[in-house]
């Protein structure tokens, strides 16, 4: 009886204590957005197919995936795409479909690593924010900044950075990227060395298949 009281007392004490333990979140360490030159949106599409799709084609996909979007007029979607900084309806809806999938899969953290550009990061963050009202009780996907740099030796380097280092990465990309498809004339070793020396986290992508 005394032992039971001690156990009960210990249990009650643990219940009232503040939980200082960590929490696990589902995380995507490497994801591309419509900003990547080879983005395809759906698994069954390739890049060329996606490029040929019209605003209306992507709208039909969105209707099947995002709750309530079929209630919106296409004119309203077009207006929103411009209002929130997207290039067109197709891009706006593509980001919305991606953000919607992150909510459905209960992804807590995601590292955006588009090829040779960081322009897609803010667009994905905005789409996640805009869909919050549809999933008020779901885990909110936190976006980490990243970029996948295509190097001269055909290897790819992923660089992960916080908002304070955005300007550093932007300047490097501006000065060293030939174009978003070709990447940089620098070797992977030079890229790794530069960003590592600056205190940024970086690693070789697809190293087991390169």
Identify the function of each model-found stretch.
Residues 35-37, 119, 153:
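Hydrophobic positions within alpha-helical membrane elements
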Residues 43-45, 87-103, 210:
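Short, acidic/polar
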Residues 80-82, 90, 116, 176-185:
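Divalent metal-binding segments
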Residues 2-17, 24, 121-210:
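Extended substrate/RNA-proximal surfaces in nucleic-acid metabolism proteins
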Residues 28, 110-111, 144:
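Short, conserved beta-strand segments within well-ordered enzyme catalytic domains
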Residues 33-91:
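Acidic/histidine-rich helix-loop elements
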Residues 26-38, 115:
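Histidine-centered catalytic micro-motifs
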Residues 99-116, 201-203:
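Divalent metal-dependent hydrolysis catalytic cores, especially in the metallo-beta-lactamase
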């Amino acid at each position: 009886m005394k032992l039971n009281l001690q156990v009960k007392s210990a249990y009650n004490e643990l219940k009232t204590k503040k939980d200082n333990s960590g929490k696990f979140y589902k995380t995507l360490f490497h994801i591309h957005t419509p900003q990547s030159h080879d983005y395809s949106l759906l698994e069954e599409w390739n890049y060329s197919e996606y490029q040929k799709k019209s605003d209306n084609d992507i709208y039909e996909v969105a209707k099947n995936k995002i709750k309530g979007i079929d209630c919106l007029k296409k004119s309203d979607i077009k207006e929103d795409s411009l209002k929130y900084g997207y290039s067109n309806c197709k891009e706006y809806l593509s980001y919305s479909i991606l953000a919607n999938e992150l909510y459905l899969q209960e992804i807590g953290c995601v590292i955006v690593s588009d090829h040779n550009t960081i322009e897609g990061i803010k667009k994905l963050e905005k789409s996640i924010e805009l869909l919050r009202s549809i999933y008020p009780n779901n885990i909110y996907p936190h976006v980490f900044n990243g970029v996948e740099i295509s190097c001269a030796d055909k290897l790819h380097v992923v660089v992960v950075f916080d908002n304070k280092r955005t300007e550093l990465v932007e300047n490097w990309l501006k000065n060293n990227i030939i174009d978003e498809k070709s990447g940089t004339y620098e070797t992977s070793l030079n890229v790794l060395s530069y960003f590592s020396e600056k205190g940024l986290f970086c690693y070789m992508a697809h190293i087991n298949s390169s």
